[in-house]
Structures are given as structure tokens and as C-alpha cells.
């Protein structure tokens, strides 16, 4: 993302799930040009490792050449929350379904940024959500 003029706003959220022998990389960069005063820019990358052999390399970057801006970035890499799994299992949800629900809830905030009525061919928000859930269930 390159902000070249003032009073810009951007919010980037990237959530990733890595399983098996996956090697994932996130190399984000936001540039704020000298004339882009009063810009607000945020970048975040969150990842969940679903196996002991999956790896994620996350490098968010900010290049700021203006002095009146509000910018931040962040990255996390972790595993599924065992306390949440225990809670769901204690209420009768099978372990695999609990993991699926955790993964779906992890990616849901990103899916919700797609406008409800957005369509690009067959890629409406419900169609994308269905594809994501199907993919999650295939490797859970």
C-alpha cells in the first residue's frame, strides 16, 4: 500500500492457517509519502499453525516519510486455543468440530470485510465463505 496524498485511510488484515508441511510468508509494506500528511494506516497479520511442521514468516513493514500520521502494524503466530477447545468439548462438541469452529471464527472477520452484495462472477461473500469452510473441513 502506497499512500501518496494526505488524509488517506487504510486497514489491512491478513489471517492465515498453515497445516502439514506448509511454508507461508507475509511480507507487507505500507509507504507513507512526504505529502501524505494526516494519513491513518494499519496493517496486521495473524496466523495459526495447525501442525508442528508448518512454518510462517511474517514481516509487516512501515516506511513513513511524513510526520503527521497515525500508523501501526503487528503480527502474531500461534496455535489453536486449547481452553476454547476444552470449553466446546465439555458442551458435547466433538474435538474435530471444535477445531473447525475455531478456524472458521478466526477467518470470519476477514470475510466480513467483503461487502454483502459484492459479486465478481461467482465470488459473492456467501460463496467465498462456503469455499473457505469447505477448505477448512478438508484439512481439519
Q: Residue ranges of each PLM-predicted region?
A:
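Active-site gating/interface segments in enzymes
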Residues: 1-140
